[in-house]
């Protein structure tokens, strides 16, 4: 099989400079050497751009390893992501993510082909320009919100717009304009300041990489005294 590299840095051929995203939020598989663990591939964890992850059913019985890039079921079409965990730890991670046993689990279609990567590269090349234009559209509509990132689905049929807003925003007109402008299905997803920092990355006052960009997934409240002690903005 050909090796491919995703622009989110999570593919198996990442350079050293992509180390932050390559290892971001990965679970250490301490069962990897246990006999029979490799054969337990019914459920697979897949990571997409930055911190977004999903769990998928390996219904075709593909032999998958960490770092394999796969095409997975989406609505509509398919998405492209990197396998980050297989084996017996996946059900434990699903419970940690509060996925119920009767939840609808989508499928892994295949390991990516060159044609899949062509669509993926074309879609990802539009993300920055789409973000800049969408910010101007939101401003022209008088919406008090900041669009911090845009993520195109692997086949280019859908785009997720991540935004920050202090108050409730009625973005029905915005969705209509965005759909007409970019000719894709639109999903708006509100995130907090720490989630945005996790997506962008950065260095904390301690001199190390931000916790929310490396390992933290549960953003509990930070007390004023703790923020003052860490010398972070209040």
Task: Give residue ranges: language-model regions.
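Acidic-enriched and Gly/Ser
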Residues: 2-233
């Amino acid at each position: 099989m050909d090796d491919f590299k995703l622009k989110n840095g999570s593919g198996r051929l990442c350079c050293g400079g992509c180390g932050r995203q390559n290892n971001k939020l990965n679970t250490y598989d301490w069962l990897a050497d246990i006999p029979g663990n490799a054969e337990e591939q019914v459920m697979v964890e897949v990571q997409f751009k930055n911190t977004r992850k999903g769990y998928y059913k390996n219904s075709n019985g593909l032999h998958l390893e960490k770092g394999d890039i796969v095409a997975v079921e989406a609505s509509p079409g398919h998405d492209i992501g990197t396998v980050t965990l297989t084996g017996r730890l996946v059900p434990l991670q699903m419970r940690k993510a509060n996925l119920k046993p009767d939840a609808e689990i989508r499928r892994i279609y295949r390991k990516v082909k060159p044609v899949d990567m062509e669509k993926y590269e074309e879609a990802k090349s539009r993300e920055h320009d789409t973000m800049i234009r969408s910010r101007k559209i939101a401003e022209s509509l008088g919406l008090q919100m900041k669009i911090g990132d845009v993520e195109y689905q692997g086949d280019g049929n859908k785009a997720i717009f991540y935004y920050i807003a202090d108050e409730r925003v009625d973005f029905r007109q915005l969705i209509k304009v965005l759909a007409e402008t970019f000719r894709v299905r639109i999903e708006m997803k509100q995130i907090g300041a720490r989630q945005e920092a996790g997506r962008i990355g950065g260095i904390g006052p301690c001199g190390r990489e931000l916790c929310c960009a490396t390992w933290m997934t549960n953003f509990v409240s930070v007390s004023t005294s703790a923020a003052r002690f860490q010398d972070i903005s209040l």
